[in-house]
Amino acid sequence: MLEQIRRPADLQHLSQQQLRDLAAEIRELLVHKVAATGGHLGPNLGVVELTLALHRVFDSPHDPIIFDTGHQAYVHKMLTGRCQDFDSLRKKAGLSGYPSRAESEHDWVESSHASTALSYADGLAKAFELAGNRNRHVVAVVGDGALTGGMCWEALNNIAATPRPVVIVVNDNGRSYAPTIGGVADHLATLRLQPAYERLLEKGRDALHSLPLIGQIAYRFMHSVKAGIKDSLSPQLLFTDLGLKYVGPVDGHDEHAVEVALRKARGFGGPVIVHVVTRKGMGYPPAEADQAEQMHTCGVMDPTTGQPTKIAAPDWTAIFSDALIGYAMKRRDIVAITAAMPGPTGLTAFGQCFPDRLFDVGIAEQHAMTSAAGLAMGRMHPVVAIYSTFLNRAFDQIMMDVALHKLPVTMVIDRAGITGSDGPSHNGMWDLSMLGIVPGMRVAAPRDAIRLREELGEALDVDDGPTAIRFPKGDVCEDIPALKRRSGVDVLAVPATGLAQDVLLVGVGVFASMALAVAKRLHNQGIGVTVIDPRWVLPVCDGVLELAHTHKLIVTLEDNGVNGGVGAAVSTALRQVEIDTPCRDVGLPQEFYDHASRSEVLADLGLTDQDVARRITGWVVAFGHCGSGDDAGQYGPRSSQTM
């Protein structure tokens, strides 16, 4: 049946039984397609009936449907003409794992960061009103814990102020990645209890109505008591007191009930909340049995069992998790903070060991950072574990609440650099540029597991300002021993015997291994290369400047945007001490990159050892000639320059 659904209008003629059959078919397809590519399975299994109802009630794209945390949009894609493309999900040139304006007119925003849909909806509704299109509804689907984000409440405050037709669907599955934390979650949980409570009152009413006059009096008394109790217990007042109408709670897996609620909401003509209760992972036993995350995300797996098809190697997150627990066993002042992602950031095990020292603040990165500042003021050493892409959301708090006060807060930045298959919204290529302008900030980029443990310990020993440690997604690189350590810098390779100190190659973090491969290629061409890992990459340490003075060309190699990254910092530092060795930066052009594997993105950007070696050879030739010993001349223009 799904093959016959090419556009939302094709749903209109289906019977309720056909809709139930279609929902089952969609779930089966979701499991098999996501099992083959990896992706967000649990959230999409939970919104099948809801998405069917949305497209039967509203006229997309005339009525925009905006998915907050856009990983809930797989079913939406299936119903808007993209079902046949799911074999390419999250692959290069294939279907995005999030809404994509390039894919379909039904996708209004490239949504993937949480708590933004209501603000988009508010703006669209205002635009439609100004254009005289008040018959257009805007639907925002908010779920997976997004209401724990403060931006949602800022938007609700504005949406409620005017009678524009905004329908806010709260997809309440009680979870983000893990169970949703906080007062809003508790309020919604109370609302979920109300249907049973209402049914009990209905039975009491029927019994009392069967009695003579005394029954009518008793019913009126009970109804007045009920109203008082409900007013005191109903968290729907959170919404109605703002001026928003409220419909629900509704069983999110009863398509007809959801459709009735949505039609009712559509008829109001103003802002309304539709509270839909769903189960993440619905209909797939392995997901339902996953108590921790209900298979929020999965890699390639066996669709029958839900088990991964290959044994995962130790990754960066696991190494960090183990190291942090080790340090915390020795120091009671170490605490950890996560913004609704204890599992993905490696803090679940920490919480099991130290339940009173892990704080899950919900999807609230700004609050997480300022709360960390408060903990540091109270003589704790907080570790904020966060994805690089989400660190952007807390920049003001890092600057004004942490750094201004010189507080010892350690930020552990996971998924730094190119992450790949999740696309432009999840690449962590901005953090070095952002943190580089924060006064007093010290940033480390470990090249391997040994250095991660080592640099985490060093960060935890800092008591006079903020620190950050960044590492990428995926398996840990092989350990790379240093030949020696000089002024805080690890020297990983030196020119072969007989070659001059032509190039100083600065490998940042995991790019140290690429730097060694590049050096080998250059050595084979007679170019002498020293490879170093600065370890603490920002601010630029004296060891880098000392070595820069003795080489003829400096090249930095980093998985960050070239604007404002380590290369730019090295160039600035050289100018400040009047070292005129030319500097070239190899990194990521400041652009948004479509989803593909990490290796595919890097190859497309020319960030392979072969391509980088070729570029450096060109610079060496342009600047002069290389040679051995004293006959090696100084290269060309005597200035620091970033490319």
Curated annotation (Swiss-Prot):
What is the primary gene name for this protein? dxs
Native species: Mycobacterium leprae (strain TN)
Q: Which Gene3D superfamilies does the protein's record reference?
A: 3.40.50.920, 3.40.50.970
Reactions performed catalytically: D-glyceraldehyde 3-phosphate + pyruvate + H(+) = 1-deoxy-D-xylulose 5-phosphate + CO2
Q: Which GO terms describe its cellular component?
A: cytosol
Q: What is this protein called?
A: 1-deoxy-D-xylulose-5-phosphate synthase
InterPro entries associated with the record = Dxylulose-5-P_synthase, THDP-binding, Transketo_C/PFOR_II, Transketolase-like_Pyr-bd, Transketolase_BS, Transketolase_C, Transketolase_CS
| Known role | Catalyzes the acyloin condensation reaction between C atoms 2 and 3 of pyruvate and glyceraldehyde 3-phosphate to yield 1-deoxy-D-xylulose-5-phosphate (DXP).
What pathway is this protein said to act in by its record? Answer: Metabolic intermediate biosynthesis; 1-deoxy-D-xylulose 5-phosphate biosynthesis; 1-deoxy-D-xylulose 5-phosphate from D-glyceraldehyde 3-phosphate and pyruvate: step 1/1
One Pfam match, given by its short name, reads DXP_synthase_N
| Subunit (UniProt) | Homodimer.
Residues reported in the UniProt entry to bind Mg(2+)? 144, 173
What are the entry keywords? Isoprene biosynthesis, Magnesium, Metal-binding, Thiamine biosynthesis, Thiamine pyrophosphate, Transferase
Query: NCBIfam families per the record?
Result: dxs, PRK05444.2-2
